[in-house]
C-alpha cells in the first residue's frame, strides 16, 4: 500500500509531517510513503528509509492562496503533485495539512468524484465522552446543500462508521434545532423524511448540545451548519482547558490538587484530542483524501496516515460507490 503525503502542508511542515511519516512506516510494515515537497527542506529532517521516497515539488500552495486559482496555476505544487500520484495510480490515498479549499479542489478535479456522488463531504471524527467518537459531515465542503446531498452524506458516513470505526449498523442522526420530528427549516424537514425512507439506522434529529454525549455514530448536516458546529466544539474545548489551567495554577493549594489530578487530566485531554481520530476525510472521491488539521504535530499526522491506511484496506471508496449505486437503482 502506498500513500502520498504533502510534506509542505500545515503550520509545522515539513518537520511534523516527516515525524508522523517516520512513525507510520515503523508501525505499519505494509506501508510505503511518497513525500512530496522541497527536497532540501525534507532532507534536513528525514532519516533515510527504504519505504519512504521523496518527490521534489518546486511550489507550495499557501494558506492564503485562493483555492481554485492556486490548484490551476501551481501545477508543480506539493499538493497538486500529491493528488496526481493518486489519480495516476501510483498511490492509493493522499494526506495534506495544507489549504483546505485547495485540497478539496484538488481532490474533486484531480482525484475525481465517485460516479453518482452529487457533492463530496468533509468529515472529521470528533471525540465523545465515552471516547468512541462520532463522524460529523459535512463541515464545509458545501455550504449549501439539498436533502438528496444529506442522504448521500448519511450513506457515506454509515459505510465509514461500519468499515473504519467498527460500528455495526451505525446510528445516523440529523443535526437540528430540536429532537421532534417536524423541527427545523425546510432542508431539515425534507431530509428527515428522506432518511426515514432509507434502510439506514436513522435515529432522528439530534441537537448540537448532545453531540459529544455520543447520541449518534454519524451526524449529518449541511456544510455551513457543520462548520459552525465544528468550530464551536473546538473553541469550547480550548477555552475549557485554558480555564482549567488558569484555575489549577492560581494558588499553592490548587497546584497541589493539579499534581494529584495530573494522570486523570492527561487521560481526559487524550480522550478529547481530535488528533487521536485522524484527519477529516473528503468523502465521495475515488480514493481516500485526508485533510489533517493545519496545526498538526507529528502525532496528528501519524493518525491521519493510520486513518488513510484503514480506509484503503477496508475498500471504503468501493463500498461507498456500491451503496450509492444501490440507492440510485431503487
From Swiss-Prot:
Annotated Gene3D superfamilies: Isopropylmalate Dehydrogenase
Primary localization class, coarse: cytoplasm
Pfam families: FA_synthesis
Enzyme class: transferase
Catalytic activity: a fatty acyl-[ACP] + phosphate = an acyl phosphate + holo-[ACP]
Keywords: Cytoplasm, Lipid biosynthesis, Lipid metabolism, Phospholipid biosynthesis, Phospholipid metabolism, Transferase
Pathway listed: Lipid metabolism; phospholipid metabolism
Subcellular compartments: Cytoplasm
GO molecular function: phosphate:acyl-[acyl carrier protein] acyltransferase activity
GO biological process: fatty acid biosynthetic process; phospholipid biosynthetic process
One GO CC annotation: cytoplasm
InterPro entries xrefs: FA_synthesis, Phospholipid_synth_PlsX-like
Enzyme Commission number, as recorded: 2.3.1.274
NCBIfam families named in the record: plsX
The family this protein is said to belong to: Belongs to the PlsX family.
Subunit structure: Homodimer. Probably interacts with PlsY.
Primary role: Catalyzes the reversible formation of acyl-phosphate (acyl-PO(4)) from acyl-[acyl-carrier-protein] (acyl-ACP). This enzyme utilizes acyl-ACP as fatty acyl donor, but not acyl-CoA.
Protein known as: Phosphate acyltransferase
Gene giving rise to this polypeptide: plsX
